[in-house]
Amino acid sequence: FLIDIRLVMNKKLSIDEISQALIDMGMDLKGQSEDENSELKIEITAEKFDMISSIGIARAINSYLELQEPVINIPLIRGKERVIVDESVKEVRPKTVAVIVRNLDLNAEKLQQIIDVQEKIHESFEKKKKKAAIGIYPIENISFPIYFKALPPKNIKFQPLESDNEMSATQMLKEHQTCKKYAHLLEGAKVYPIFSDSNNNILSLPPLINSHTTGRVETYHKDLFVEVSGHNEHHLNSVLITLVSMLQVMGAEVESMQVEYAHENYTYELNVDPKIKTLSREYISSLVGVELTNNEVIKLAKKKSGLELFTILL
């Protein structure tokens, strides 16, 4: 983990300097290994969600130590591909957000970090995929547009990830180890959500598992379809921004997608506009209990990493 942080730091820091910076930022360090491949154990709380990856932590340290300007926007290419959301998902998993990631130069380490971050988000912040489930797929075998719809479980059949045989959704929930872990999330549902392409190839059964044939990412894949499904679009957008920020640091270009809800006459597209907060210097000083000068307020505000802009009335 420490090695990962150092790869994207703007200055070479010792493990003690990194540890102290994290403590000063209010992070809770749970321990540090003593071997040559030192690891820091850090508790990431919900309000610091953008620091779930080592890239996010490095970016925050860079801003806090004034090694770079805080990142407040994400370059986004306007895309033409679509995800079409069917009304059938309304009662089971009604929302999704999505982008296409292009020209990602993957290696084994980067791919493992993506997988690790995906698992950390699911297990630590998303109530084991109840609030949000992330799906990542190579687009080379996908025919657009993509459909997000729900079907009776007996009508869903594909080869789940890391399995040798095709199975029905009913079988997966009973027999597949990963699916059994999350089966309670679909308990009692008459229909299950799926992502499929325009050729009716099933990409995944969220929040359970991807297809082995269309949802397995390898290091040679450069272009990916990334989706997050759940119930609250604002929250899903935040999760997607966290993933997109990490992938961009890895060298990827991010292309927006239109997520069309025909039954609601509504279209979603990734919102990367920074949040704008208007605060007075007097109010800030009253919160911290110290009278701050104009320059001190500006300097401290710039230490804050994340997609936020502060309009400060000085």
Regions picked out by a protein language model, each given a short descriptive name:
Residues 1-314:
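RNA/tRNA-interacting regions in translation and RNA-turnover enzymes
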